A protein has these predicted regions:
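Active-site-facing substrate-recognition patch
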Residues: 1-64, 75-84, 92, 108-144
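Structural motif
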Residues: 66-69, 147-149
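PRPP/pyrophosphate-binding module of the type I phosphoribosyltransferase fold
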Residues: 116-194
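Conserved beta-strand scaffold positions in the cores of enzyme catalytic domains, especially
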Residues: 69, 100-106, 177-179
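Glycine-rich phosphate-binding loop and adjoining helix at the ATP-binding site
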Residues: 84-103
Length: 194
């Protein structure tokens, strides 16, 4: 798993540049409706995430390999009014910048859930796995032995990654699945090195 930054959970946007970027990235569309000026902050965060993933892949990806980016879906179904395609926007931008990188909306949630960053309950990979399914229209483009990078904004417990990787590897057991996260979450006062 790769991550570029450290996000300090429980701290506000003023705590660090990363906290500000992550919180802007997570601005909800209903918040933007109430305050349209916030859209620019969300868009800048999306662009910055895409820029950093592009730089990482240009630096680390063997140019002879192809990579499929798969956004880990948000907690809401596509038809839900609070559905947010922010991670999808990131992977689209990255794929547009690197010719050996493509993207697929390979995963979707079947039931909308409360977003995990707003819940007090823990993250359970089994609960997440139960509502994840493969998008069959996208699955037909996966080749055996593909390299898939699951992309998400913050790695907290790894529950979403674990559930998503399991769902993909059930169908495509010879596929290599890695994770790319913009940031790893740490608790306030805990070093990111631990």
């Amino acid at each position: 798993m790769f991550y570029a930054r450290t996000y300090t959970a429980g701290q506000g946007y003023q705590y660090s540049e990363t906290n500000q970027l992550i919180l802007n990235f997570k601005i909800r569309y209903d918040d933007i409706k109430r305050n349209p000026q916030r859209r620019q902050y969300k868009q800048r965060a999306i662009q910055q995430f895409a820029k950093e993933v592009t730089a990482l892949l240009r630096d680390q990806l063997d140019p002879s390999l192809s990579l499929i980016l798969v956004p880990i879906p948000p907690s809401k179904e596509r038809s839900h009014p609070e559905y947010d395609d922010r991670v999808e926007q990131v992977v689209k931008a990255v794929a547009a910048n690197i010719h050996t990188v493509s993207w697929l909306p390979l995963l979707q949630v079947t039931t909308s859930m409360e977003s995990y960053h707003s819940r007090s309950a823990g993250r359970n990979p089994e609960d997440i796995y139960a509502v994840l399914q493969l998008d069959e229209a996208s699955a037909k483009y996966c080749q055996p032995n593909s390299i898939i990078a699951l992309v998400d904004d913050v790695l907290t417990s790894g529950a979403h990654f674990t559930a998503a990787r399991r769902r993909i590897q059930e169908r495509f057991p010879d596929t290599t699945v890695i994770g790319i996260f913009w940031a790893k979450a740490v608790s306030y006062g805990v070093s990111s090195e631990t």
